[in-house]
Amino acid sequence: MKPAIALEGISKSFPGVRALSDVSLALYPGSVTALVGENGAGKSTLVKILTGIYQPDAGTIRLGDTETTFPTALAASRAGVTAIHQETVLFDELSVAENIFLGHAPRNRFGLIDWKQLNADAQALLGRAGADFDPTIRLRDLGIAKKHLVAIARALSVDARVVIMDEPTAALSHKEIHELYDLIERLKADGKAVLFISHKFDEIFRIADRYTVFRDGAMIGEGLIADVSQDDLVRMMVGRAVGSVYPKKEVTIGQPVLTVSGYRHPTEFEDINFELRRGEILGFYGLVGAGRSEFMQSLIGITRPSAGAVKLDGEVLVIRSPAEAIRAGIVYVPEERGRQGAIIGMPIFQNVTLPSLSHTSRSGFLRLAEEFALAREYTSRLDLRAAALDQDVGTLSGGNQQKVVIAKWLATRPKVIILDEPTKGIDIGSKAAVHAFMSELAAQGLSVIMVSSEIPEIMGMSDRVIVMREGRVAGRYERSELTAEKLVRAAAGIETQADGRAA
């Protein structure tokens, strides 16, 4: 079978960095190819070349039997190449339908936008993407997961022969993920060539037919997914066997550091109570929309609770803003790190040291050497992949930007750190590094709240787990009694067979 599109001998360099070196990739009609690699391996650069955002320094692109170039993103789109990115650009002030058909809206015989047709077509595309909401509503009124479905519908609006999905399930619920799997099967049946980029091996082995592995900008291997194991892919990705992805150290849990009592919000959550102890990793699990992130944002002063009390080291604490939380020793690493954490246009080292300038200044003057030393300490412990610390953080891959944000808040030397989806979008090698660092911090006496939607991560790293459902605590479990079934039942409100009650 001939590839729908093939890249041959592609190379691309940026100042100080060789992003791709003589790589090749072939995508076949009716087949899903998984592109696998650590953050910084070159996956994002290749996707940008495929979609006309970057131009290769060397190599060729073949569309069917014809050699071609994509000088612009529009040229790639017109050639039938479309992409669903982790951070697909959408516009909050436009309607869902307008976002879907931006740049190629249906028009009537007078050349004006046919709004009735546009909304009808948008509704049909949303249905194909597994969404059932009104296409006329403003995008700003949707949550993260639904915005992601709009991005999928937008990609489907172009009659593409090649569909690129870059971490498409990152913000989706379990139900939406299964609907996406069904959509991919329909794309295959329609003869589309699908490039699937994911760090979740269960997804890769469920839906991919072929694989291609990148490491440090080079292609390491390719073939049929049926011919490899997860361990094989890991070894190709990192050049070594990754020991334990969840290196949880056994530590002596101390006295309560943070106590939360009767915390509630008019619309997001109610009656949240718990204690967080010194050296403990407390996991918060739940499905999308359970209220975990909303509660954490209220806890650190982004939103105001309607009732409740917080004590830190036994002292009542009133937090009116994130700045007050940071001064008290509570920091929050958000889920949307690209939008809420990293400052694009600023160097890596300044991103890391920005909240910690009191540690790197003397008599009101910044000391550059101390800034670099502080940034180097925390970025190296998280295995950041960057050419230099004065590099613009915007040039890093998404996973490495996440590491910069985590390093930034750890550098403040807090008492409590809240990590919201700490390894979302991070490759398996980097996950192990982040988990090892979390375990080390807990062993040193730092108290950690970890919000995660990944059951293996929750079970592998937590000393205790609180499950939330619909803004309430639905279950509490010690590490010794954790099972995947208990977590899922509590999160979904599934009745236990033993007593007929919801978990």
UniProtKB/Swiss-Prot annotation:
SUPFAM superfamilies, alphabetically?
P-loop containing nucleoside triphosphate hydrolases
- Its chief place of residence is membrane
Give the coiled coil ranges: none
Q: Which InterPro entries match?
A: AAA+_ATPase (IPR003593), ABC_carbohydrate_import_ATPase (IPR050107), ABC_transporter-like_ATP-bd (IPR003439), ABC_transporter-like_CS (IPR017871), P-loop_NTPase (IPR027417)
Q: Which reaction does it catalyse?
A: D-ribose(out) + ATP + H2O = D-ribose(in) + ADP + phosphate + H(+)
- Subunit arrangement? The complex is composed of an ATP-binding protein (RbsA), two transmembrane proteins (RbsC) and a solute-binding protein (RbsB).
Q: What is this protein called?
A: Ribose import ATP-binding protein RbsA 1
